[in-house]
Amino acid sequence: LQKQDERVVEIELERLRGFVNHPFKVLADSQMIELQESIKKYGILNPLIVRPRQDGTYEIISGHRRKFAAEKIGYRKVPVIIRVLKDDEAVVSMVDSNLQREMISPSEKAFAYKMKYEAIKRKAGRRKCGQVDHNLGKKSIELIGEECGDSPKQVQRYIKITELIPEMLEKVDDGSMGFTPAVQLSFLKKKEQKEMLDAMEFAQCTPSLSQALRIKKLSADGKVL
């Protein structure tokens, strides 16, 4: 389907599938309740964006929360726009549409940036000879920063924290550990991160930036934490 030929159609919920490795959480929170109430009152104003799969189902590019809300209030079908997208195009589109949300946790943004970064790199690697791309001189990180409103350095930091163990990431998301110290701790091996987590739980505190930098250096020097 070409973009100019797009139209809204209704698809059964049972034929919709979540995006593979979707980095954005769908939570049954107060915002979800508000969304459900809005759908009850006005219907789904913005159609979901989906792409066709070979088995006759559709993968959601944008609209995971709307699908969840529609299921909860008993909808059988939802309005969608069907787009034929290659895998990497779908990743970029999914990330871009979800980054527009007001409330995004650090871990959601981190994994979204990582997925987009890897997709852009793959697309660039497959570029055919003779094709003109005005962004060829820019790094993938810089492109993401320009499009998403973060500096290239900040994009790199977000991607780096995807190397944290889940329990560490939870502390970043809930605000109990600062983002910048977390970036430094992401350089630790997984075993060291678990030991660090145990120490944090025992002391009931999280490291400052200066402490995290010292811990990172100890790890790099091969010394026991």
Language-model segment annotations:
Residues 46-52, 83, 97, 114-121, ...:
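Low-complexity, flexible helical/coil segments
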Residues 41, 101, 119-123, 202, ...:
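A structural signal for alpha-helix termini and helix-coil/disorder junctions
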Residues 12, 150-225:
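Amphipathic alpha-helical extensions and coiled-coil-like segments
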Residues 1-3, 130, 153, 210:
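Intrinsically disordered, low-complexity regions enriched in polar/acidic and amide residues
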Residues 24-25, 32-33, 67-163, 170-173, ...:
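Amphipathic, charge-rich alpha-helical segments that serve as recognition/docking helices
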Residues 1-83, 89-103:
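Short, charged/polar connector segments at secondary-structure boundaries
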Residues 61-62, 137, 174, 211:
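Residues at the start of alpha-helices and the adjacent loop-to-helix junctions
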Residues 22, 44-46, 100, 131, ...:
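Glutamine-centric residue-chemistry signal
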